[in-house]
């Protein structure tokens, strides 16, 4: 396979979606770096899980390891200071009057991608890869394809340099995301994602289910569970 010679920077939280996107990028680009954000998230355990995932990817997929470069962590704790959501404070997850769940952190992906583009510019990377999706998602406006296309234009103009935002999961269901992971890395990648990635909004890792660790009842766990069941049912 002829790989793209550009460097890609993957927004890598340590979850199922970003791990699948990282595998996707490693099959396509000559050099790949990773980036995470510490923004005061309630499920901060994902920052520990992502290090395990990176280590496992390097160990289990030596061909990918050759292209997997530096990992970066940026402190965006200011986001928790200016937001009041169920992802940054201890509160019940519920639907708000505007139709969005209170897990929506306003401006999060806009800030993430702006910071990622700044880092990418310094690292001579021209591709940003994110796990945003508007199919099986909670209606977050900063996950929509139109939002990200507009942001790609703004970043490219603002940096006076081409910046491409790749979203390989944008139009996939969660079941199709499991299928993509299997296509990319077979059973080993599926098992790695199941065992080591983190999705649960509450940061729960004490309970192990067929689809992975989590509380089993928050929206993120329910979506992952349903997607896994649909994937198994369609095989």
UniProtKB/Swiss-Prot annotation:
One function term, GO molecular function aspect: ATP binding
Keywords, ordered alphabetically: ATP-binding, Ligase, Metal-binding, Nucleotide-binding, Queuosine biosynthesis, Zinc
Superkingdom, natural source: Bacteria
UniProt record similarity statement: Belongs to the QueC family.
Role played: Catalyzes the ATP-dependent conversion of 7-carboxy-7-deazaguanine (CDG) to 7-cyano-7-deazaguanine (preQ(0)).
HAMAP family: QueC
Name of the protein described by the UniProt record: 7-cyano-7-deazaguanine synthase
Annotated organism of origin: Leptothrix cholodnii (strain ATCC 51168 / LMG 8142 / SP-6)
Gene that encodes it: queC
């Amino acid at each position: 396979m002829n790989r793209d010679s550009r460097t890609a920077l993957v927004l890598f939280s340590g979850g199922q979606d970003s791990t699948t996107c990282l595998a996707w990028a490693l099959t396509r680009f000559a050099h790949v770096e990773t980036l995470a954000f510490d923004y005061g998230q309630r499920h901060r355990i994902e920052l520990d899980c992502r290090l395990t995932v990176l280590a496992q990817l390097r160990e289990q997929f030596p061909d990918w390891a050759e292209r997997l470069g530096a990992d970066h962590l940026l402190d965006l704790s200011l986001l928790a200071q200016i937001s009041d959501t169920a992802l940054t404070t201890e509160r019940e997850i519920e639907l708000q009057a505007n139709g969005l769940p209170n897990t929506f952190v306003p401006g999060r992906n806009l800030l993430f991608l702006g910071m990622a583009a700044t880092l990418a510019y310094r690292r001579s990377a021209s591709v940003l890869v994110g796990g945003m999706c508007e199919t099986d998602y909670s209606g977050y406006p900063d996950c929509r394809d139109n939002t990200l296309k507009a942001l790609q234009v703004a970043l490219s103009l603002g940096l006076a340099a081409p910046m491409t935002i790749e979203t390989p999961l944008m139009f996939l269901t969660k079941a199709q995301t499991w299928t993509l992971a299997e296509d990319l890395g077979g059973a080993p990648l599926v098992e790695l994602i199941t065992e080591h990635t983190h999705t649960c909004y509450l940061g729960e890792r004490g309970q192990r289910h067929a689809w992975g660790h989590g509380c089993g009842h928050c929206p993120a766990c329910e979506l992952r569970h349903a997607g896994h069941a649909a994937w198994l049912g369609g095989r």
